[in-house]
Design a protein with these regions (language model features):
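Serine-hydrolase catalytic machinery in alpha/beta-hydrolase-like enzymes
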Residues: 2-3, 10, 14-126
């Protein structure tokens, strides 16, 4: 089927979490009610959860089962390689050099946050 086959997303919601909640802020799009499958889509450095919203109607086909697309926002943090500018990033990037020290703490925190999202989807009936 060609892109844009009319399978427009049916529901839109934005979930903002209080600071004490370890769950990331997300944008969620459902193709129909009662989704049994989820796609968790991470954005890149400096982008945000809204960046991939427009592509969903181009990806979805009418004959597909109901889907939930979950677009989490990475935390805003200083990014060393960008002069310490605060932007959305899953972890700090120390430099462009492959030998640069990796932000293990930030990487592990992002892994934990994504695992929390995956668990939440399971609690919502996604197997």
């Amino acid at each position: 089927m060609p892109p844009g086959d009319g399978s427009v997303v049916g529901r839109y919601s934005e979930r903002r979490s209080p600071r004490s909640d370890p769950t990331l802020e997300t944008i969620e799009l459902e193709t129909r009610s009662g989704p049994r499958f989820s796609v968790i889509w991470l954005h890149g450095l400096g982008a945000d959860a809204h960046d991939f919203e427009p592509i969903v109607p181009e990806l979805v086909r009418a004959h597909w089962p109901a889907l939930r697309f979950v677009f989490p926002n990475a935390p805003v943090r200083p990014i060393t390689v960008n002069g310490g500018m605060r932007m959305r990033g899953w972890y700090d990037i120390g430099g462009a050099d492959i030998a640069s020290k990796q932000d293990e703490v930030g990487i592990r925190a992002s892994i934990g946050a994504i695992n929390t999202l995956i668990a939440r989807e399971g609690e919502r009936g996604i197997a």
